[in-house]
Amino acid sequence: MLSQNPTTVAWWSVRMRATGTLDDEPYHVSGAESLVAPGMIEQTVAGLTQRALAPGHTVKARQVRVSLDQLDVEPTIIPALPTELKECPDPVAARQYFVDVLSRFVPHPAEALRVLTEGPTMRGAAMVEAGTDRRLEADPLRGVRVTKFGDLTESAPGASLAHKKHHHEAVLLASKVAAAPGVLAEFCISDDPHYTRGYVCVDGVYTTVTNVKADGDPNGGRVILVDTARADPTTITTWLENHPVLIGPATASSQKATSWHGHLCGRLNAWRAAGLERRPRTFCSAQDPDAVTTDGPALLFSSSDYLGLSTEPKVQQAMNNTVRRLGSSSGGSRLTTGTSVAHHQAEHEIAAWLGYPQAVFMASGYQANIATIQLLADPHVTVISDAENHASLIDGCRLARARTVVVPHADLDAIDTALDCVTTDRALVLTEGVYSMGGDVAPVGELVEIAHRHGALVVVDDAHGIGTVGPTGRGATEELPASQRPDVLLGTASKALGVEGGFACVDETLATLMRNCARGYVFSSAPSPVVAAGVAAAVEYLRTDTRRVCSLQANVAQARLLLAEADLIPPSAAHDRGPIIRIPVGPESRAVAAQEELARRGLMVGAIRYPAVARGDAILRICLTARHTDEHIRILVTSLREVLDGALSDAPR
């Protein structure tokens, strides 16, 4: 271990490059670098020279150059990354692991992997922009070099450098890369034909991956994923190539608790660097258009209280009466003490209103979706799932371990083709009624006909359609004949109904099965009877009074027309009926900048980013309500046009 204070030593960079010839062309044989104190220069030069001339290289060195450069700035001292091991049985499994990790950052992970395995040989690394797959290095044949780094823990660098230590040297290099501004992750496959390991550096942890290639394979490379909103490519390159760094011992390699902390901090930092961090806004008022938060007044265009029923006196009175009569808690699951007369009333009202024999009421729409799909699907079921389905539907498929086929959004031909190819015992088609990110209405009737022709079950999640579309607000299926209605209709009470909870509308057989076997129903505490009473009152209100539904639909039509005229949405979206309006923005950083500028103008609009939408396809998500006025909508359209045209013209793209 060095005894000198590293911040008071005049450090030197000692670099070695050895070249030979192969097929009459120059060939790189070996290269290494170390930062050393003056007293260690001689032994370092000797060690690097010994490495260059050592037998075993593919090509014999014909020229060895050793250069010495005194640093003009003090090196930064950082700890080495904690290390882990990912054992893979073969290159196929190892490369799938690379693809799985890459998919967190780039839309086409297989393309990024090809840079590692099939790209032209270069001594540096490829710099790839997260979210776009765009290559950023100035010279793709040279790549980005990582230089001017050394090992602060090495007591005899000359002897150490005489023989290459792949793992140790890779950890040092990766530690410097991970500390660079804007870097999210690094991936490496060694180009040494006889070194069959690679590494992934992400979330502040260096993971060695075994069997990334066959012995004798000379191909390899490195990819550094960066966030250009955090640092531009020139800044990142300059830091990697010129900023001196000394790497000390890992602070967490042998302490599990510290390792966990570092791992979690790394994940959080990577999430932040990708522009994905969110913070909740705290409300001091109800979800009215003219809302009040702890940051001040806000014109609200991001609430799902579409009809304003959360402040409807009849709903509130029903809840007040119930809390006095039945208490504030259910006290248990639905099969123990958690079912009250209020729960039965809510289920009866929902089923009668939406035209199904039974409704099964649960604590949230998310829970109802997962519980229903987990019950229906299993490894013997193929689920045909729309590409824009909500996370709760996706999670339900994962928990069920069903074979899931994702089809393009609202593509009936793709659904038909997928059903033709089903080889499992049963099939299930899964879609939303009104899509939660775009507000478009699914072609449910035609979809049901196709699915039933193949003997498949149809499940429709109409969380954003119930209460908002249809002549009387009964959702995307209201006008369909019985032959075109889905087998299972999922919904929520937390949006248009203005309360809480979720439900599945089903037949008698499935209702009984769910009440006995659906895990989200059996093993979760029941929603409060107060909530159930509010849901029953909200449904009863809508059965007898549709004026709020009409007001909402008029606002949606007006807003879509004005937004299309302002070129903020495509003409095709002007005629969609859903209360959610998708404003395409692009990069996450631009969506956040737009959201912040709108907030400064007093408007609260959601910036929807990965993982709710694809990386690089962020949107502003407008939610209309029955209580918005013509003036509110005019302010919205004008502000959006000004912000997206003017205030963000210089925002990162």
Swiss-Prot record:
Keywords: ATP-binding, Biotin biosynthesis, Ligase, Magnesium, Multifunctional enzyme, Nucleotide-binding, Pyridoxal phosphate, Transferase. Pfam families: Aminotran_1_2 (PF00155), BioW (PF03744). Pathway: Metabolic intermediate metabolism; pimeloyl-CoA biosynthesis; pimeloyl-CoA from pimelate: step 1/1; Cofactor biosynthesis; biotin biosynthesis. Its EC number is 6.2.1.14, 2.3.1.47. Pyridoxal 5'-phosphate binds at residues 365-366, 436, 461-464, 492-495. One of its GO terms (biological process) is biotin biosynthetic process. The modification N6-(pyridoxal phosphate)lysine is found at residue 495. Substrate binds at residues 278, 390. Its cofactor is Mg(2+); pyridoxal 5'-phosphate. It catalyses: heptanedioate + ATP + CoA = 6-carboxyhexanoyl-CoA + AMP + diphosphate; 6-carboxyhexanoyl-[ACP] + L-alanine + H(+) = (8S)-8-amino-7-oxononanoate + holo-[ACP] + CO2. InterPro entries: Aminotransferase_I/II_large (IPR004839), AON_synthase_class-II (IPR050087), BioW (IPR005499), PyrdxlP-dep_Trfase (IPR015424), PyrdxlP-dep_Trfase_major (IPR015421), PyrdxlP-dep_Trfase_small (IPR015422). GO terms for molecular function: 6-carboxyhexanoate-CoA ligase activity; 8-amino-7-oxononanoate synthase activity; ATP binding; pyridoxal phosphate binding. It comes from the Bacteria. Homodimer. In the N-terminal section; belongs to the BioW family. In the C-terminal section; belongs to the class-II pyridoxal-phosphate-dependent aminotransferase family. BioF subfamily. PANTHER family: 8-AMINO-7-OXONONANOATE SYNTHASE, CLASS II AMINOTRANSFERASE/8-AMINO-7-OXONONANOATE SYNTHASE. Catalyzes both the decarboxylative condensation of pimeloyl-[acyl-carrier protein] and L-alanine to produce 8-amino-7-oxononanoate (AON), [acyl-carrier protein], and carbon dioxide, and the transformation of pimelate into pimeloyl-CoA with concomitant hydrolysis of ATP to AMP. This is Biotin biosynthesis bifunctional protein BioWF.
